[in-house]
Amino acid sequence: MIVQANTQRPIAVLFGGQSPEHDVSIVTALQVMDALDPRAFRLIPIYCDFDGGYVTGPALRRRDNFRPKPTGKRGYFAWTDDGPGLVCDDKSTYHFDAVIMAYHGLYGEDGREQAHLERLGIPYTGFTSLYSALAMRKDMTKEFLASTGIRMLPHAVLERPVGGGVPSRQQLQQTLGELAFPLILKPCSLGSSIGVALVQNLAEVEAVLPSILAKDNRVLAEPQVQNLIEYNIAVRMTANGPITSAIEQPKTDADLLDFKEKYLSAGGGKKGLSPPSEGMLSLTRDINPALPPDLEAQIRSIATLAFERLGQRGAPRFDFLYDSEAGDLYFNEVNPIPGSFGHFLWEAASQPLLFPDLLPAL
């Protein structure tokens, strides 16, 4: 049986996955599907469960239909005689023109799913598999962009020894070298606020490293920026070249903006040894804060340059760290698929673009 298309353009929305950001991905996908014009698009939700299997069906438009088991048909991606589609176990095929990638984190945002679709010839939104994989590795992103002259913090990478466990104190001292404490430690390949720890000395590095290495084999170490203000901005391509969104300044009283605070609630923090976090739905933001013209120009220019070097696809968000007393701006990292695609940044841009209009533009 073939599920026939109608006058609407069939679009698949792919989400879920096996990362710690699985539930955030569901929220993003539901918001994407709610925002797209049903007169122009026929939406096919495709949910990737924790086992890596694909499920589709109209019930997946409802948030309460994912637990304990998703409601729908199981299938696999294929290029059929009628183009790309999801071939289901009951022999039905849901055809679509392209896939909107609504994943967050590993096994979805890191290039593996993109490579799967590329191999099948299926069009999709966002970074290519190569740049997705590069962007997921925070250390490799820095090395890749180093030749551009973009200013970044000095860093070191702490790796799990081949035999397991954690590096010895001597190895830690050698690897950290001249990096000055306090340091921020974070997994190289997880979301921007998962497993992040603030450490004041080598003993604290040794204390938190086992829990971070349980999440990732590589840990990025960087000096903590003093007098810190964070700025984020998104970039996308148009027919006239790249354009930038509004700038946001996340507001927090914590030393670290962790996963729970960034995506689920507004939390607090304390100085000293900060345990790794468990991870923007309710985050307080200042949109288009009053900035010195030269600082705003730097943020927009650096984000655009990084976007160009990373393939000029999607609407990635670029995150910056700013020392407000020294006046030093540092590129921090790129988020290829921001939560709900950072629609609030585009709605407040100098040329406003509402979420329902942003999605077709991708």
Where are these regions (language model features)?
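Active-site nucleotide/adenylate-binding loops and adjacent lid/helix of ATP-dependent enzymes
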Residues: I2-F15, S19-P20, V27, T93, ...
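ATP-dependent carboxylate activation and anion-phosphoryl transfer catalytic cores
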Residues: I2-R9, F15-Q18, M280, T284-L362
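Residue-level detector of anion-binding/catalytic polar loops
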Residues: R42, P123, R151, R218, ...
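A short glycine-rich, hydrophobically flanked beta-strand micro-motif that places a catalytic Asp/Glu
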Residues: I44-I46, V219-P223, Y231-N232, G311-E325
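Short acidic-glycine loop/turn motifs at beta-strand connectors
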Residues: D49-D51, M237-N240, D323-A326
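Phosphate-binding site of ATP-dependent enzymes
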Residues: A197-E278, D294, Q298, L329
